[in-house]
Amino acid sequence: MSTPDDRHHSLPRRRFLAASGAVLGLGALHALTGTAASAAETPQWRPGVRFAPARNWINDPNGLVHFQGEYHLFFQHNPDGDQWGNMSWGHAVSPDLVRWQELPVALEPDELGEIYSGSAVVDHHDTSGFFGGQPGLVAIYTSAGDTQQQCLAHSSDRGRTWTKYEGNPVIPNPGVQDFRDPKVFWHAPTGRWVLLLAVGDRIHVHGSPNLRDWELLSEFGAGHGSHGGVWECPDLFELPVDGDPGRTKWVLIVSINPGGPAGGSATQYFLGDFDGTTFISDGAPDEIRWVDRGADFYAPQSFSDVPDGRRLWLGWMSNWDYAEEIPTDPWRGSMTTPRQLGLTDTGDGVRLVQQPVDELAAVRSNRRAWRGVIGTGRSPEFSGTSLEVLATFQPGAARSFGVDVFAGGGHRTRIGYDVAAQELFVDRTGSGTALISPAFPARHATPLAPTGDRLPLRIIADRSGVEVFAAGGRAVLTDLVFPDRGSDRVHLFADGGNAAVEVEVFDLTP
């Protein structure tokens, strides 16, 4: 996990969520806090379908796991303030990845230090010996005191209460500064648990039969990918290519801060093979593959034990360049919409693809649709502040085309495609409250070569952020925005010529 100071030097990190039994999702601020909104509070920016805590600071998602009918989201949280510090594990649960209930803080600092990022697993066969032969939840996290060390906690009551292991730390610090963010999963072919650890700008792989006794197996990272900042929050999982179970690749996820393509923090990935001991990348050492080229997708983690086998994840929707300055109150920080992952073969090789989870369709309402030509004459206008937009464009002679969201009062967030540059972009320079930091107002873009005469866009515009998925999720941009009150219009645009479009717009109402 990163800290605000990782831009200059590396320090330990911390965690999140306030204790509340309220169901989050509609931005019902009074129900969440039990108090009247003050003039400083900003309910207009509380996400509708993305998770945000009732109050105070959050950053990285931690311990994502499904167990006994619930998705668990733990997260870095400061229960006592809206700045990074006093890191604890906040906790929320959901039956469907859309409607979240915030629970009391799960893990608090102790004599070993603050509670930094980590993961959680279901110990189905009680390999740890914590559960008397029954399944239970085990959290693996970094304790950050004088040094960073890896520790365990376990729960026998569906994650409601936790007992820290008396033998902590299970992986002591070997004398390095950055030694954190354990990600654990069961590797069936070798019959053992595997743990990934971010160590400086490397990933260490450990193995264990019981979650308590760990052996260092291998190291990855020298000369591979981006080393513009400290490496953090690793993840590793296997995915089929284009859904073919006979053709799979392992995906290694590494977040870095700083060094991202949009400035500040970002997440890269590597494709390759993993035999339970060693990850071998199949890409050129100097090749850098970014998960998301927007500014605000960091430290993603995937869920363990998803019942139908999908690989699902979410990330922290912020950037360390300005995370402590975003203008929301009484909370600071939110997560992205959960996404489902896949691999697809493109003209440039196999690439990671992302789409919002299928569960999001259940909260669609108020469908509006239009088909026609834009660029000359009047185009349709829609409205809303928590929306899903599905648009398929045929460019025609247009030089650029796309969708403006959160428009009105001279402001807009422009999402579009530049035909000549062959790039998808989000322009938030005119999005409203932009001057929270010199790094904030910007245009972010990602390469996207055309694959035919149509470009499908899927946009989640949820009150204080946009998530854009193009061409089946081959190109993704995630950006925070803070529109002014009344900036709730959606327009289609085409510059330099006409473009044909088919569009559907849905309200998102959990």
Predicted regions located by residue number:
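N-terminal secretory signal peptides
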Residues: 1-11
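Juxtamembrane helix-loop transition sites at the ends of transmembrane segments
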Residues: 4-5, 33, 492
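N-terminal export signals
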Residues: 9, 15-35
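Residue-level detector of intrinsically disordered/flexible regions characterized by low predicted structural confidence
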Residues: 32-34, 61, 469
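Beta-rich carbohydrate-recognition and catalytic domains
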Residues: 39-182, 186-231, 240-293, 317-370, ...
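Beta-rich accessory regions
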Residues: 245, 273-287, 291-510
